[in-house]
Amino acid sequence: MTSVDCTAYGPELRALAARLPRTPRADLYAFLDAAHTAAASLPGALATALDTFNAEGSEDGHLLLRGLPVEADADLPTTPSSTPAPEDRSLLTMEAMLGLVGRRLGLHTGYRELRSGTVYHDVYPSPGAHHLSSETSETLLEFHTEMAYHRLQPNYVMLACSRADHERTAATLVASVRKALPLLDERTRARLLDRRMPCCVDVAFRGGVDDPGAIAQVKPLYGDADDPFLGYDRELLAPEDPADKEAVAALSKALDEVTEAVYLEPGDLLIVDNFRTTHARTPFSPRWDGKDRWLHRVYIRTDRNGQLSGGERAGDVVAFTPRG
């Protein structure tokens, strides 16, 4: 696991967070502009780790920042039970960390059809949530590359923890294509590389249709044959050709074999390289007592893979266009 202990940087990070507007949702563009300015002053070792990860990625496909400043549990609001967050909600420390770290990496992005087009998402258990939703708790959220079916798929998924689940059993699972690729034979690699396969989309992107079918085309592996990007979704990728099904099954098995579990604690921030990994979450049991697991999520776009065409700003909200 690639991780950075940020405990020693607490005073500096709190000082940087104090420079940010107190109600980020009131003017998110201004908040993220301020975060970009402040991110230039991140502690040297942390800044270097982020810049290196952004430029090169890692074998693990993720970077875990531990020991970031966070409120004491008693000082946090109750875990949310609805979304989106109120516009006047005061800035939480882990939201500030997502602003600083995210602006060091790229541009925070909202997706119009998802979470009312908001950029900052609260992730919490919700009774009766759809099995494909991050709000599930008591069922496995299966492996998926976030929005692999979206032309403007984010480069990074960032998850910051303000409150862990009571039993500390919820694990974020991450599997890296850089680790899985050596487990695939040459024939399987060749079959998967740059081959478009039918893919369904998440509920939010179905336009109110219960089951529109596989409206996107996703390449399971693409780019450099020796260091490819990954497009994988265990629930939504729907190959039809028997040889394609066999190759995807081999990829799925390889990803299972290289899976790492990350147990997020308060003050942890996980950066997932969404072009080289797939991630999941194990079940946990909420108590519905106002103190259940509470993460904050943002999506970051960079200039890789045609995500940016010029003129974009951190805080932009983009519309859905399926990959084809």
From Swiss-Prot:
Top-level taxon in the UniProt lineage: Bacteria
Pathway(s) this gene product operates in, as recorded in its UniProt entry: Antibiotic biosynthesis; clavulanate biosynthesis; clavulanate from D-glyceraldehyde 3-phosphate and L-arginine: step 3/8; Antibiotic biosynthesis; clavulanate biosynthesis; clavulanate from D-glyceraldehyde 3-phosphate and L-arginine: step 5/8; Antibiotic biosynthesis; clavulanate biosynthesis; clavulanate from D-glyceraldehyde 3-phosphate and L-arginine: step 6/8
S-S bridge residues: none
Enzyme Commission number(s) from the entry: 1.14.11.21
Pfam families according to UniProt: TauD
Positions of transmembrane segments: none
Binding site for Fe cation: H144, E146, H279
InterPro entries from the UniProt entry: AlphaKG_dependent_hydroxylases, Clavaminate_syn-like, Clavaminate_Synthase, TauD-like_sf, TauD/TfdA-like
EC category name: oxidoreductase
GO BP annotation list: antibiotic biosynthetic process; clavulanic acid biosynthetic process
Cofactor: Fe(2+)
Keywords: Antibiotic biosynthesis, Iron, Metal-binding, Oxidoreductase
Residue positions binding 2-oxoglutarate: R293
Reactions accelerated catalytically: deoxyamidinoproclavaminate + 2-oxoglutarate + O2 = amidinoproclavaminate + succinate + CO2; proclavaminate + 2-oxoglutarate + O2 = dihydroclavaminate + succinate + CO2 + H2O; dihydroclavaminate + 2-oxoglutarate + O2 = clavaminate + succinate + CO2 + H2O
Cofactor binding, per record: Binds 1 Fe(2+) ion per subunit.
Cross-referenced Gene3D superfamilies: Clavaminate synthase-like
Gene Ontology molecular function: clavaminate synthase activity; iron ion binding
Family note: Belongs to the clavaminate synthase family.
NCBIfam families in the record: ClavSyn_CS1
Name of the protein this chain belongs to: Clavaminate synthase 1
Organism: Streptomyces clavuligerus
Source lineage: Bacteria, Bacillati, Actinomycetota, Actinomycetes, Kitasatosporales
